[in-house]
Amino acid sequence: MLSFFRRTLGRRSMRKQAEKDRLREAQRAATHIPAAGDARAVITCRVSLLDGTDVSVDLPKKAKGQELFDQIMYHLDLIESDYFGLRFMDSAQVAHWLDGTKSIKKQVKIGSPYCLHLRVKFYSSEPNNLREELTRYLFVLQLKQDILSGKLECPFDTAVQLAAYNLQAELGDYDLAEHSPELVSEFRFVPIQTEEMELAIFEKWKEYRGQTPAQAETNYLNKAKWLEMYGVDMHVVKARDGNDYSLGLTPTGVLVFEGETKIGLFFWPKITRLDFKKNKLTLVVVEDDDQGKEQEHTFVFRLDHPKACKHLWKCAVEHHAFFRLRGPVQKNSHRSGFIRLGSRFRYSGKTEYQTTKTNKARRSTSFERRPSKRYSRRTLQVKASTGKPEELSVHNNVSAQSNGSQQAWGVRSTVPVIPSGPVVVEVENLPKSPGADQHDKKWLSAAGDRSQRGGNQWDTRALSPPHPAPRNYPAFVHEHNVKNAGAQQNAHFPGPAAMTDI
């Protein structure tokens, strides 16, 4: 009897405490979306949006991921939702995308409240295909975070232009009576922001007079899309030699990096199989041999954790389906050449082809652009011109070598660098790996010769122009292919110790 009362009272106290936690969490969030029905049978999900605000959503305990995603899209009034996803971290600090077909509680183990982040999942290969102004605005916010966190590297000149577009979109036209050069120091655009860069941004901002926020954001995206690592979803892997490599998922295929050097590209049409088992990822690629016959090559990579391996596999499946197919693969389809073994996972959303063909911009939409986070202003030691716009002579001091944090953008400076203040962003570190042993790379010449005829590119010299796009290949994807297919000279790929060649 006593044990019965203990269990009953204990459960009641736990329910009361959970209810208090939900209310407290809802008060902390900027927006609270209550659940319909019995309030005792709900879970609380807290979603951080790209503009820095939080939304607290109450859902039934057995709610699936799609229900939460639909609530967020309805809250934002976002039509082009297929480019976005909800991301969360597991107990092993592995990032995952919320699966809309599975229960939230079965995926997100840490909670309640269950904390997730709205992120761009698929970077459009052609931002001009984005129909809605709100979608372009969210893309700009995501790219700002990518650049600020260091995930997306950006040359000095490009960083200055993008930052100037940000100022134009947020502050409007430059006003001599209101704006001074010190104003730029209140914003954060890059991980290491020097005074020279802020002066260059200030001068560039003057040139964009007359652009509306929507025009400035469109120009921002059209500039950012040419960055080498734009839209590349990086995953750190290990080869059998123990060295770190990176696989980058793109609209055209899978890039392979050794450190920061691009050493190969597997085009999606040439990848015949992609499997995983525990923490081992297997990639099977076909290419033409000397007699013109197709020959299979198997590459094996390992990850630190089985969950990270499955996450990489799922991301590859989704990228292939979103950018390459006209429609998602049906579950009852017998064509399972690309997706094999035990997982039943299938990409169920719209493809980019469907999104660009079916979505139409609404005649009138309204949304609020939230101001960026401001920091304390600093006094510039070098004054900028506040009169007629002139060319700033920053580029006369460009150095060929980077020497310390002050030279991070290749600019020689005579004034001290004031580092950026702390910024809360989602950081995804790029790999830093030592070079592979020379004896592991003797096979490169033969592979490089084969690559000039096949569909996969490995080189000891500069690469030849990319191969023609397959039939029915979207034109904008082919354009993105041409941009990303290049590799640096003297590149190497891990030797036979790292790969199993069948």
From Swiss-Prot:
BP-aspect Gene Ontology terms: actomyosin structure organization
Residue segments, region Required for interaction with CRB1: 29-119
UniProt topology in membrane: Peripheral membrane protein
Gene Ontology cellular component list: adherens junction; cytoplasm; cytoskeleton; photoreceptor inner segment; plasma membrane
Sites of Phosphoserine modification: 433
Region spans: Disordered: 359-391, 430-470
Domain FERM stretches: 43-327
Primary localization class, coarse: cytoplasm
CDD domains reported in the protein's UniProt record: FERM_B-lobe (cd14473), FERM_C_NBL4_NBL5 (cd13186)
GO molecular function, one term: cytoskeletal protein binding
InterPro entries: Band_41_domain (IPR019749), Ez/rad/moesin-like (IPR000798), FA (IPR014847), FERM/acyl-CoA-bd_prot_sf (IPR014352), FERM_2 (IPR035963), FERM_central (IPR019748), FERM_CS (IPR019747), FERM_domain (IPR000299)
Keyword Membrane in annotation: yes
Keyword Nucleotide-binding attached: no
Localization of this protein: Cytoplasm; Cell junction, Adherens junction; Cell membrane; Photoreceptor inner segment
Superkingdom: Eukaryota
Coiled coil: none
Protein keywords: Cell junction, Cell membrane, Cytoplasm, Membrane, Phosphoprotein
Role summary: Plays a role in the formation and organization of tight junctions during the establishment of polarity in epithelial cells.
Protein name: Band 4.1-like protein 5
